[in-house]
Amino acid sequence: MKRFIIKGPNKAIKGEVNISGAKNSCLPLMAASILFKNKVILKNVPFVKDVLTMKDLLVSLGAEVDISEKKKMMTITNKKNHKLVVPYNLVSTMRAGVLTMGSLLARYPQKKIKVALGGGCALGVRDTSWHLAGFKSLGVNNSLNKGYVNISSKNGLIGSKYKFPKVTVTGTSNLIMASVFVKGTHYIKNISIEPEVIDLINFLNNSGTDIKFLGKRSIKIKGVKELVNGIHTIIGDRIEAFSYLCVGAITNGKIKINNIDPTNLRSEIGILKKIGYKIESNDNSIKLISSKKLKPIKLKTGPFPNFATDNMPLILAVLTTIQGKSQIEETIFSNRYMAAPELNRMGAKIIIKKNKATIIGQKKLNSADCISSDLRTTFSIILGAIAANGSSKISRIYHGLRGYYNLE
């Protein structure tokens, strides 16, 4: 699949969507399977491109992976020791490959491990320095050679203390996994509390780890000898959920999202209400109902529970169709506004200055030929296209397949 052709504008879209399991939860859970000497069974698995790439990575390391797309289930079996080299060809398009560092370290702390630096979306600085600093607090030595991080610990992993300089999702997950078998207790401060990180912690604790919160962003991990009962149902994907809420919003429709915990989208729901959309929710679903009285807003992205940076390109597209001046401040990634020039090709008026965007909303967009550059930009352009007059062609649609199941 090379491109989408979308004919707009779409009339008010109405209906229900059953949300997939969270890709950003599934990937670290798959990496965590390395910690187990027996089977790990994951349910509600989203079989998107990144998940299939991670499957291939685990197989390359020596695991057996059986999947049932119909049942949305994956079984990972570790019958033998893993290979300790994570190759570049399997992480070049997927940053989550870096998460194997923590789990491989925990299983094989005194062995030499080589992990290629990965890819993913080109959103700005996303280095591994905080991951490696966290590992160092456990007694790990590291070096960089020809694009590979080399890590090992002569004396094994010993619990101590570490505080992340800034909240990092993958850094938190990596250090948690590295710490599950430590000698003693490891204390970690300023961790990410994204729903996907909490999902990982719940999975590990249900499998025998001893991870306790000492405060909102502080935990202690008491080392254990082994993990058991690796069975887990993945949480619903909050980014996919918000994507489809935005489909309803930008078409003045009415849409219900199932298989999602509304508390994982508390900031996003608050923003939609401020704009003027009516939101109804219960424990496992969210319904958006459009309104004729919509107004521009100001928002700022940030670590959970703030407005998610992944959802910013989506609301950006919606705001281009709401009359008035809206403002966005992006605090996580330097290149998160990749959708702006493509939306401007459709007639949107988005002005970018450093990490801030000013959106002069208007009622109509026009079709255009656009190029996708990353996962969330893809869906942002799709949102623009379904609201635009005429047929829009979107190239490099493969970026969207990394994170959206059955996008077509």
Q: What residue spans do the PLM features occupy?
A:
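Short, structured segments at the rim of ligand-binding sites
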Residues: 1-408
